[in-house]
């Protein structure tokens, strides 16, 4: 595997899940990789994403020292910035996902230029327009609230 820039990276959205992802890692990847995705067009940037483990501390009286334990894993939120295109099928799906109040998540696939893929399940938490200036490109800023681990599929 070599290093790359982000150029050529693509992100896709699939229809809403109808159940929770399987707890088994391999089964979740099998399910996610078998879905039909729509590419989100005109993507300028994909914000940071990935798990952070919460710090749980315990202050033992006898030891006089804090102990750190691992708590909840949180993949956080990721901000997508796209050039606004009301006719783009992927952006239409993002808006539909934003308006959807279901408890189930939407699968996303991030495909890198070297063929590696990340999958995750998220809710679309915001849908804002920006770049409204004389020489600005009208953009859509979308926040994804990630509710699963990041399933990395590495090419051999």
Residue spans for each PLM region:
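Short beta-strand and beta-hairpin "edge-sheet" elements
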Residues: 111-150
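Charged, amphipathic alpha-helical segments
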Residues: 77-97
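Short, acidic/charged, Gly/Pro-enriched secondary-structure junctions
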Residues: 90-121, 125
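Viral virion structural and adsorption modules
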Residues: 1-5, 143-145, 149-156
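Residues within well-ordered beta-strands of beta-sheet-rich folds
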Residues: 79-81, 107-109, 143-145
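Short acidic, gly/pro-rich beta-turn/loop elements at beta-sheet edges
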Residues: 21, 90-92, 118, 132-134, ...
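Solvent-exposed edge beta-strands and adjacent loop segments
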Residues: 2-81, 125-137
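A generic structural signal for short beta-strands and their flanking turns/coil linkers
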Residues: 74-78, 102-106, 140
């Amino acid at each position: 595997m070599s290093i790359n820039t982000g150029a050529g990276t693509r992100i896709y959205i699939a229809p809403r899940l109808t159940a929770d992802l399987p707890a088994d890692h391999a089964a979740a990847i099998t399910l996610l990789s078998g879905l039909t995705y729509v590419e989100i067009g005109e993507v300028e940037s994909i914000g940071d994403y990935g798990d952070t483990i919460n710090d749980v501390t315990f202050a033992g009286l006898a030891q006089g020292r804090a102990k750190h334990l691992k708590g909840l894993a949180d993949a956080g939120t990721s901000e997508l910035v796209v050039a606004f295109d009301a006719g783009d099928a992927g952006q239409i799906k993002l808006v539909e996902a934003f308006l959807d109040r279901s408890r189930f998540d939407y699968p996303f696939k991030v495909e890198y230029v070297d063929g590696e893929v990340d999958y995750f399940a998220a809710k679309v938490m915001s849908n804002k327009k920006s770049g409204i200036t004389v020489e600005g490109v009208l953009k859509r800023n979308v926040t994804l609230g990630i509710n699963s681990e990041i399933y990395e599929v590495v090419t051999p």
